[in-house]
Amino acid sequence: MKKIKIALVGQPNVGKSLLINALCKANMKVGNFSGVTIEKASAKTFYKNYEFEVIDLPGTYSLDGYSEEEKITRHFLNQNDYDVIVNVLDATNLERNLILSAELLSLNKKMLLALNMCDEAKKEGIELDTSILSQEFQSQVVEISAKTKENLELLLQKIIILFESKFIPRSQFYTPLCEKSPEKEDLLYFINELSKKIITHKKEERNLTKKIDALLIHKFFGLPIFLFLMWLLFQLTFSLGQIPMDYIESGFNTLGEFVKNNISNTFIASALADGIIAGVGAVILFLPNIMILFLGIALLETTGYMSRVAFLLDGILHKFGLHGKSFIPLITGFGCSVPAFMATRTLKNKRDRLLTLFVINFMSCGARLPVYVLFIGAFFPSEKAGNYLFGIYILGAILGLCAAKFLRMTAFRGLDEPFVMEMPKYRMPNWHLVWFMVYNKAKMYLKKAGTFILLASLLIWFASNFPKSEENLNDFNAQERAIEQSYLGQFGKGIEPIFQPLELDWKLSVSLISGLAAKEVMISTMGVLYSLGKDVDETNNDLKGIIAKNIPIPSAVAFILFVMIYNPCFAATIVFSKESGKLKYTLFLFLFTCTSAYIVAFIGLHIAKILLN
């Protein structure tokens, strides 16, 4: 079987990621904002006796650019570690796309032009004379639709023919293809004239996108609409997620009781019920909320709305020292900090990139969501829970803006750069791809629950049960004394004075420390530490009830505020260190976020006390 290595190249928003999904059935992220493919990604497919390895390179407008994505693409193409270049173009916006195509031709490699979104071009009355394009660019042209999978088999056939044919260097149809000004202006003129020959509009261009934009990015209505959509997302995240949560919680409680009642060895029964089931179950409990949140974010991305919000918030972000493009990493941070940190590569200015890296942590990631849902469900009525959840996320964003202003005035001074960003057309989401985006997130969440969090739960259970107490543990007070004398209890009592001003007990203090590894571990830790009271008080036989009974509301407020701001998980911290480039920035992140969290939590504690008195 022969192997063909394909470099998939194109400008942002031309559908490269969608194409690689269609060709290789790869579950890759697809979005409508610049830089969705931050790193080189690959997938494989097989056709006839050939194995195709498709390298999805970051979207780039030019090979002359200096952003991280453009550097990655240029470096890969200059390495010659591929057989064929497949240049993907947007058939509805061909003229702009051809500039990159001309630059790619100057590499003098085997290249094929794939005109994507031809189905949309036909709907808009756009006709393309591909014979002229093929002749002028001395390359094969294939009209395809990654969305409907039209002509994808033909594309593979053309790639095979190109791969098997002997490469004949092209005659230079235009000399200064990759030169800079003033020749670059001549290239633009050439592309413009060529486009007039290739492109024919049979009817007026549809202006549906403009009509929608007139409302969604309106000067007065745009921001309220965005806030309403965010409120609706968090409202649905809590209210819809609550329905399966009750069944999942009941199932794990029943399973734990079954294990305790049917395993005679109390040591093994406790390890399984109080360690694994209580710890892992407490994390899996919030899977529905996680899936609903990621579904909402995926829909906003794939429809093209997120790019509009970046434009809408540019003025506000600039006032706080952030760049308009910072919005993309920031909104990604609501899902997970790891891809959010990586998405800062779209920012060319180093100061803007570093500032955005620091502020991302204030955007509550999906791993923090279970903590919020747990505490909101414990202390507030369910009909208002969505409002409180929305308020927590908005408060985190506001604190992030304040932190950005502070850092811009101190550590990251510099001039603002202008904001230029492409506005893609609105598109109906591809439900198959949206599902796989959500499925992948859920799969990662469950994988973490079944590996890392399972081990953490066992470790926490062991540390909270040893050394063994000689007392009769049928008494609740004896159980409390036993856990306080355990290794975990001794550690918790040791760090308790640090968190005493926040009025957090040693159990919450230990939960915060465990959250440095992964925020989900906090839920697992509380699930183990607070599970002792289950057998004693039957009216509070779930984690929410136990927390509501044992933690005062002001302390709960302080805990939530601390969780909202302090250092990201270990995996995200490693990525932050890599993206920032220096260890000193990682140390500063830890000190800055933990100090900010402590101050905000202290203020929140006393405000809550005043309001409750």
From Swiss-Prot:
The keyword Transmembrane applies. GTP 3 binds at D56, L57, P58, G59. Changing T254A: In strain: F38011 and M129. GTP binds at N116, M117, C118, D119, S145, A146, K147. Belongs to the TRAFAC class TrmE-Era-EngA-EngB-Septin-like GTPase superfamily. FeoB GTPase (TC 9.A.8) family. Fe(2+) ion uptake in diverse strains of C.jejuni is much lower than in E.coli and H.pylori. Site-directed mutations in FeoB cause no defect in Fe(2+) uptake. This is Fe(2+) transporter FeoB. The gene is feoB.
